[in-house]
C-alpha cells in the first residue's frame, strides 16, 4: 500500500494534452510507495459561485475530498494568453475557502518553456491560498512540439530522470512536513 498519495491536476482539458501526458508519465515513474491520483474532473466543475458553497455540487465535493486525502498536489499546466487556463483557475477558486489546501505541499510542472507567466501566476495564487510551494520540485520539461505520449516520456532517459528527481524532491518535502507535524 502506498505511503504517499499525491493529487495531480492537469490544467488542460485538451485530449492528448502534453501536460496530462507529463502527469501520466510521472505516475508511471513513481515508486511503489507513492500513488499519483490523476484528477480529470476540471470540465465537470460548475463556474465558481460563492452562493453555491453551502450546498456544494458533488463534483466540487469530490475535488475537495481527494485533495484533503492527498499528502501533496502537483499541477501541470499550459499557459493561455499569459495566464492560467480558466478551468484550472475555476477549480482553485472552489478550493480557496476550504481547509483542504492549507499547508498542502504543492509543486508545478510545465510541458513548455514558454509558460513562465502562468507558472508565476499559479505560484502566487497557490501561496495566497496557503499552499506550501516546493520550488525545488517545480520544473519545466520541454515537450512542446515533440508529440510524446506518457510511455515515450517515461522511456526517455533525460525526461524520466528529471521527472523522477522532481518527484523525489517533492516526496522528501512532504516527509519533512510530516516529521515537523509529528514533533
Residue ranges of model-derived segments:
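N-terminal beta1-alpha1 ligand-phosphate binding loop
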Residues: 2-33
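Glycine-rich phosphate/pyrophosphate-binding loop and the adjoining helix
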Residues: 2-7, 55, 134-183
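A general structural signal for well-ordered alpha-helical segments in protein cores
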Residues: 6, 19, 23, 60, ...
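Short hydrophobic segments within beta-strands
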Residues: 9-11, 39, 109
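A generic structural motif
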Residues: 31-37, 132-133
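N-terminal first-folded block
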Residues: 35-46, 69
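N-terminal beta-loop-helix "entrance" segment that forms/cooperates
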Residues: 41-58, 148-151
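Helix-loop-strand module that forms the ligand-binding subsite of alpha/beta enzymes
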Residues: 55-130
Amino acid at each position: 500500500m502506498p505511503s504517499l498519495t499525491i493529487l495531480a491536476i492537469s490544467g488542460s482539458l485538451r485530449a492528448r494534452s502534453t501536460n496530462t501526458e507529463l502527469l501520466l508519465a510521472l505516475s508511471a515513474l513513481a515508486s511503489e510507495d507513492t500513488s499519483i491520483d490523476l484528477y480529470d474532473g476540471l470540465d465537470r466543475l460548475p463556474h465558481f459561485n460563492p452562493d453555491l458553497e453551502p450546498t456544494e455540487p458533488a463534483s466540487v465535493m469530490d475535488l475537495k475530498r481527494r485533495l484533503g486525502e492527498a499528502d501533496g498536489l502537483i499541477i501541470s499546466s499550459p499557459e493561455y494568453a499569459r495566464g492560467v487556463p480558466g478551468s484550472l483557475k475555476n477549480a482553485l477558486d472552489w478550493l480557496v475557502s476550504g481547509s483542504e489546501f492549507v499547508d498542502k505541499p504543492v509543486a508545478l510542472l510545465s510541458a513548455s518553456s514558454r509558460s513562465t507567466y502562468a507558472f508565476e501566476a499559479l505560484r502566487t495564487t497557490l501561496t495566497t491560498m496557503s499552499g506550501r510551494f516546493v520550488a525545488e520540485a517545480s520544473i519545466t520539461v520541454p515537450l512542446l512540439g515533440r508529440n510524446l505520449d506518457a510511455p515515450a516520456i517515461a522511456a526517455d532517459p533525460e525526461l524520466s530522470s528529471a521527472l523522477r528527481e522532481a518527484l523525489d524532491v517533492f516526496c522528501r518535502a512532504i516527509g519533512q512536513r510530516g516529521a515537523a507535524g509529528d514533533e
